[in-house]
Amino acid sequence: MAIITDVYAREVLDSRGNPTLEVEVYTESGAFGRGMVPSGASTGEHEAVELRDGDKSRYGGLGTQKAVDNVNNVIAEAIIGYDVRDQQAIDRAMIALDGTPNKGKLGANAILGVSIAVARAAADYLEVPLYSYLGGFNTKVLPTPMMNIINGGSHSDAPIAFQEFMIMPVGAPTFKEALRWGAEVFHALKKILKERGLETAVGDEGGFAPKFEGTEDGVETILKAIEAAGYEAGENGIMIGFDCASSEFYDAERKVYDYSKFEGEGGAVRTAAEQIDYLEELVNKYPIITIEDGMDENDWDGWKALTERLGGRVQLVGDDFFVTNTDYLARGIKEEAANSILIKVNQIGTLTETFEAIEMAKEAGYTAVVSHRSGETEDSTIADIAVATNAGQIKTGSLSRTDRIAKYNQLLRIEDQLGEVAQYKGIKSFYNLDKCGR
């Protein structure tokens, strides 16, 4: 039988050495599922609540024993007896049990751990891969990866404001080849950094965190690495993306983007209009295909102006702006702000709500990018979600650190399992951009 008989959570560590949750779900048949919960460093103001203990004498206040107790003593009692295949009913039951708009009572981390474990247990019961269980028979698209090879902002100690400099192998024929291209550029970049006497230590997401002279220096160095690895920059090869994480350096009182927060005294201070001009300047100068959080999460006028200026040429991804929430996404669609949503399961807290956000985005002609968090685990669920939803894009870090590679390796397995059915769309993943042949 597929009936849930036990739910158990424990406290484990994430890739930063901070506590997080691992949840296990058991059924009468012996089918079993386990889910682990990621955590972000730069978090959106409107994200669902990640419940922490606040006890400074233990893990600096970051313990998750309250969330663990909520799973073991509250959620377990509520969902034991459910059919493990009834994902939506279980997720809705947990949302109702919490009763708050931001999951602040039980904790989104507690709810998400259960949601993932339930899905994995259902797949185990049906003896099918997780991506097949979640996506059905039409599952076939391997995502084009966003590879974060330079870390800045809140993800490193490097004096550069933009949080991520990414490469996307849009011209590769398969996911396996895309991964190889990215790995070779990553190693070429390491060699170039060493030759310049720059640091090759890696940040939270596995990218390098050197002391560049500025944003342009970072981009120019990546372009050299692409060439050194034997590839070309552009639509037939490898393109570049940014996660500006602009909310991290936006000064709401002064209404300016203050780069000096990360770059020191020489950092620019830009108004919203100047921020848009600067991003357009970068797009005109370099082969940039995607920009995430180019404006502050509450700067709706700025987002609309940025979209009007660049929305036909560049993917403009809302992360902190949308926080995987259909209410914010619906407003963005209505006001024509952004043209893509970043999907982070722990921003919203259940797989059901995650899938609803992806579906809403697609129906509106927005792209959806399935994403990791800076604090990750060996859990590879997001790889399965990316394929299950045919999202077409995934953002899961650089080509180092096992917590990042776990997702890439799972995608390699899935591509093998799908065989001739597997599709890698590359540049066609950006189906809502003029430059991609719409």
Swiss-Prot record:
<keyword id="KW-0964">Secreted</keyword>
<dbReference type="InterPro" id="IPR000941">
    <property type="entry name" value="Enolase"/>
</dbReference>
<dbReference type="InterPro" id="IPR020811">
    <property type="entry name" value="Enolase_N"/>
</dbReference>
<keyword id="KW-0963">Cytoplasm</keyword>
<comment type="similarity">
    <text>Belongs to the enolase family.</text>
</comment>
<feature type="binding site">
    <location>
        <position position="395"/>
    </location>
    <ligand>
        <name>(2R)-2-phosphoglycerate</name>
    </ligand>
</feature>
<dbReference type="GO" id="GO:0006096">
    <property type="term" value="P:glycolytic process"/>
</dbReference>
<keyword id="KW-0324">Glycolysis</keyword>
<comment type="pathway">
    <text>Carbohydrate degradation; glycolysis; pyruvate from D-glyceraldehyde 3-phosphate: step 4/5.</text>
</comment>
<dbReference type="Pfam" id="PF00113">
    <property type="entry name" value="Enolase_C"/>
</dbReference>
<keyword id="KW-0479">Metal-binding</keyword>
<protein>
    <recommendedName>
        <fullName>Enolase</fullName>
        <ecNumber>4.2.1.11</ecNumber>
    </recommendedName>
</protein>
<feature type="active site" description="Proton acceptor">
    <location>
        <position position="344"/>
    </location>
</feature>
<dbReference type="Pfam" id="PF03952">
    <property type="entry name" value="Enolase_N"/>
</dbReference>
<dbReference type="GO" id="GO:0009986">
    <property type="term" value="C:cell surface"/>
</dbReference>
<dbReference type="GO" id="GO:0005576">
    <property type="term" value="C:extracellular region"/>
</dbReference>
<keyword id="KW-0460">Magnesium</keyword>
<dbReference type="GO" id="GO:0000287">
    <property type="term" value="F:magnesium ion binding"/>
</dbReference>
<dbReference type="GO" id="GO:0009274">
    <property type="term" value="C:peptidoglycan-based cell wall"/>
</dbReference>
<dbReference type="InterPro" id="IPR020809">
    <property type="entry name" value="Enolase_CS"/>
</dbReference>
<feature type="binding site">
    <location>
        <position position="374"/>
    </location>
    <ligand>
        <name>(2R)-2-phosphoglycerate</name>
    </ligand>
</feature>
<feature type="binding site">
    <location>
        <position position="163"/>
    </location>
    <ligand>
        <name>(2R)-2-phosphoglycerate</name>
    </ligand>
</feature>
<comment type="function">
    <text>Catalyzes the reversible conversion of 2-phosphoglycerate (2-PG) into phosphoenolpyruvate (PEP). It is essential for the degradation of carbohydrates via glycolysis.</text>
</comment>
<dbReference type="GO" id="GO:0000015">
    <property type="term" value="C:phosphopyruvate hydratase complex"/>
</dbReference>
<feature type="binding site">
    <location>
        <position position="243"/>
    </location>
    <ligand>
        <name>Mg(2+)</name>
    </ligand>
</feature>
<feature type="binding site">
    <location>
        <position position="344"/>
    </location>
    <ligand>
        <name>(2R)-2-phosphoglycerate</name>
    </ligand>
</feature>
<keyword id="KW-0456">Lyase</keyword>
<feature type="binding site">
    <location>
        <position position="319"/>
    </location>
    <ligand>
        <name>Mg(2+)</name>
    </ligand>
</feature>
<feature type="binding site">
    <location>
        <position position="292"/>
    </location>
    <ligand>
        <name>Mg(2+)</name>
    </ligand>
</feature>
<feature type="binding site">
    <location>
        <position position="373"/>
    </location>
    <ligand>
        <name>(2R)-2-phosphoglycerate</name>
    </ligand>
</feature>
<dbReference type="InterPro" id="IPR036849">
    <property type="entry name" value="Enolase-like_C_sf"/>
</dbReference>
<feature type="active site" description="Proton donor">
    <location>
        <position position="205"/>
    </location>
</feature>
<dbReference type="InterPro" id="IPR020810">
    <property type="entry name" value="Enolase_C"/>
</dbReference>
<dbReference type="GO" id="GO:0004634">
    <property type="term" value="F:phosphopyruvate hydratase activity"/>
</dbReference>
<dbReference type="InterPro" id="IPR029017">
    <property type="entry name" value="Enolase-like_N"/>
</dbReference>
